[in-house]
Structure formats: C-alpha cells, structure tokens
C-alpha cells in the first residue's frame, strides 16, 4: 500500500447487526460515510437480515424484526453494496475508518469469504488504546468520543457511529502527528502489532483471574 493516511480523505464504515458474534451475525444497518476535504456523503442502508433480530440486539440499535422486514432491502444486496463501496473507496485512495475493525470486517468476511482487506484501514479503537495505554475507563466509542470531545448523537445508529469514528480518527492524527508520517504499510503493521500485544495482555489477565476465555489476536480480520 503506497502513500500515507490522509485525514481529509476517509471512508468511515459501521455496521449494526443481529448479534455480537461476527461469525454468525447478519447485517441490520450498514453505514458508509465518505469524507473528502469539506465534502461529506452519507449512505446508510437498512437490511432485512432474513432471521429474527434478537431482542438484545434490537435494544441496542432500535430496529425490530418487523421493521426490518417491512422497510429493509434484501440482505445480500446490502452486503454486496457495502463491499463494493469499500473497494471503491480504496480504489479512490481513501483510508477505511472502522472502530473495532475486527468485528465489522470479520462480519463481512464471514458473510462473503471473498472479502479481503486490499487497502489501508485506520482503527481508532486500536490506536487510542496504544497511544493512551494508561487511561482508565472503558474504550467504547461513546467513552472515547467523550475523551476527545467528539459529539456522538444517536449512539449505535450506524451512520452516527461512522461519523464519530472519523472525527476521533482526525483528532488522533492531530494529537499524534506521527500517525500521518507513517506509510500506509507501516501504519497497518503497527496497528496489527498493537492489537496483538493488547490481546496477549488480555489473555494473560484472563488466565490470572482463572478464566478460560480465549481471545483473537489477529487484526483487522479475526482468524
């Protein structure tokens, strides 16, 4: 990957889904927010996932099975358009912004095994966790937005989350200018390394607590 991360040319992506397991989740809403200079183009698509949306998921994003069935596009159509837009963004030279990329991108891979990461990804979750290792508190998008004074209205609405993630990415580059000095390849490798190290530490913590939970060490798509 050539070039560097340009915060003025981003494609920010977020999914709301039927569940927390990326291997089984179906898309409910998909948002892609294209930012180029002062121009912004928002696309949010509602999908009919073809299955019941669990009440726990509806409680998070507010979309019920009935609403998705009545108003949503066919699931495979939303999936295909999402992947097409991401690939187009990379072809146009944009960096893909995904907060906690290992969830959203792993969902795409599980739903379409042909999906691959062919362009640069910037994950504010991973970067913030590395650059502010000792900050206490949760690393949810809401908490990180509060730390960087980024407004987040309608949390867990895909488009709102995508916009907020892009704003956090921009704030990170202002606070840590070395992020835009790295080449795209260097930034991808750095994030992969930071994620791996963080997950190894998390696994060690689980073991210390006597818990048998296993964690994923791969970024930006879980193995």
Q: Can you annotate each of these PLM segments?
A:
Residues 1-28, 34-41, 66-223:
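DEDD superfamily 3′-5′ metal-dependent exonuclease/proofreading module
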């Amino acid at each position: 990957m050539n070039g560097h991360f340009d915060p003025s040319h981003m494609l920010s992506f977020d999914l709301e889904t039927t569940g927390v397991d990326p291997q089984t989740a179906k898309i409910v809403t998909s948002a892609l927010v294209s930012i180029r200079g002062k121009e912004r183009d928002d696309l949010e698509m509602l999908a009919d996932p073809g299955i019941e949306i669990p009440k726990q998921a509806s409680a998070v994003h507010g979309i019920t099975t009935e609403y998705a069935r009545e108003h949503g596009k066919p699931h495979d159509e939303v999936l295909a358009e999402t992947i097409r837009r991401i690939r187009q963004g990379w072809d146009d030279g944009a960096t893909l912004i995904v907060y906690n990329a290992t969830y959203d991108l792993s969902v795409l891979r599980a739903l379409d095994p042909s999906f691959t990461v062919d362009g640069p990804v910037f994950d504010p979750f991973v970067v913030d966790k590395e650059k502010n290792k000792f900050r206490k508190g949760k690393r949810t998008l809401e908490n990180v937005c509060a730390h960087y004074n980024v407004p987040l209205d309608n949390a867990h609405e895909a488009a709102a989350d995508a916009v907020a993630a892009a704003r956090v990415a921009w704030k990170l580059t202002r606070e840590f200018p070395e992020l835009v000095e790295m080449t795209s390849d260097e930034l991808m490798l750095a994030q992969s390394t930071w994620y791996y190290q963080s997950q190894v530490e998390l696994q060690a913590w689980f073991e210390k607590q006597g818990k048998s939970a296993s964690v994923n060490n791969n970024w930006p798509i879980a193995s």
